[in-house]
Amino acid sequence: MAEEKSTLGKIFTDWQVLIVLVLVILSVLSIYAIPPALDKGISGNLQLGLDLVGGSWIQLSFKSEVIGYESDMSQSDFITQLSEKLDADVIPVTSSSVEIREYYTKEELESVLAGMGAKLVTYEQGISKETADTVKGILEDKVNTLGTKDVQINTLTGANDVTKYVRVELAGTDINTAQEIVSSQGKFEIRIVTSGNETERVLSGDAVTSVSTPSQRNNYWGVGFTLSAEGAEALRDACIQYGAVTDPDSHNLVMLLDGEQVYSAPLSSDLAAKLSKGPVNDLSASTGYGEEGYNDAEVLEIHLRAGALPVDVEIAGSSSVTAERGEFIQIVCIAAAILGLLAVAFMVYYRYREPSIVVPMILVNLSEIIILLGIARYIQQLDLASIAGLIAVIGTGIDQLVVITDEVLHEGRVPSPSLYLKRFKRALGIITVSASTTIFAMLPLALMDLSTLKGFAIITILGVLIGVIFTRPAYGKIIMAILSKKPAK
């Protein structure tokens, strides 16, 4: 008994073992107590992906293209002319490339540029990385505004920095609701009537900087919003250019949301007078009267608060997992993990015939998984790929612990302390090289925006790092303390 207490004392006073214990405690607190989440069952605060709780994913493509061009004119003149000819927003990307925020085929653009005395050099359907970041932020704001939980939004950007797709994963959301939330993109624009039924684009939704709550004026519901300084200046210039300031009745201001008209009326005399003197930032979009008008105002507010997407999108792919199937997959994953640990325990015992090796090995492996989950809860949803990563961490972890055990043992006994430490350092060297290889192999998968194996790579890398830095050294000290009571060879 005294010998066992002495062994435990050696183990629990070693600083490397204490670090692992502290990390395990912090991880458990993170999963179940910060914030309190005991009512959520075994998953606690872990972020479960749609594979495990049910939900939907939607992949969107962009009705836009990034082109490279050659032209003798300045870029500002080129953009102005191209924007007028296409009636679309044209945004500079580099000194020789632009983003066109409407869909045109390569042949159509070659013809248009030829008419301008320019040449089309490259053509890529998609948007610039900067616009992609804007779209991602807008979608995140939109789904957060709607109260949707557990959302993952990732973009797929190629080596040429052109983003072709954005993928939205909404856990706990059915496919119809997901499509309504995501594909209803709130593309807002203001146009002005030039003559007859002809209109010209004035500005798009990214000029909207703030939005008020729905309010009633003269029994009509509407949403007030504020334009940026550039947007207000563009509105004033257009109203003066097309005569809306001097003849407002002939030049309605038209507001469109997703191509549908939500407001059309001439400038008020008060607004016309203000515009003649300077830019006006505060405007209002009327949505009608009664309950329908109020509901439309609420929808408009949501889209404007989230920010209107600068480009049109279309659904390129979608799928869903039912909540029942998600629960079934959770059960299968838990069962697989338990069976895996039991199988590992059996094989380790069969190899060493020594319970004092099996128990520490399994406990160290479990502590590694707990620490990994405690960290992953902040940075990674647990989907099937992530679960596969956890199982891989269990397997590679046991492999490395076996390497340590085989290296330090001599005929089942611990050698002298100096020889033990020498062999232990050699084992850690082997493990570190192996871990480095794994990390470098997984990095490309972890850095790919839309890779379905991204979760697998992230979990595997984290698990390997936790093992090499914390749990492997602790295991070495535990084994040394437990088996040191055996006679040295």
Curated annotation (Swiss-Prot):
GO CC annotations on file: plasma membrane
GO BP annotations listed: intracellular protein transmembrane transport; protein targeting
Keyword presence, Transport: yes
Keyword terms, alphabetized: Cell membrane, Membrane, Protein transport, Translocation, Transmembrane, Transmembrane helix, Transport
Protein's cellular compartments: Cell membrane
InterPro entries xref list: SecD/SecF_arch_bac, SecD_arc, SecD_SecF_C
Membrane topology classification: Multi-pass membrane protein
NCBIfam families: PRK08343.1-3 (NF006217)
Family in the record: Belongs to the SecD/SecF family. SecD subfamily.
Subunit note: Part of the protein translocation apparatus. Forms a complex with SecF.
Function summary: Involved in protein export.
HAMAP family according to UniProt: SecD_A (MF_01463_A)
Protein name: Protein-export membrane protein SecD
Native organism taxonomy: Archaea, Methanobacteriati, Methanobacteriota, Stenosarchaea group, Methanomicrobia
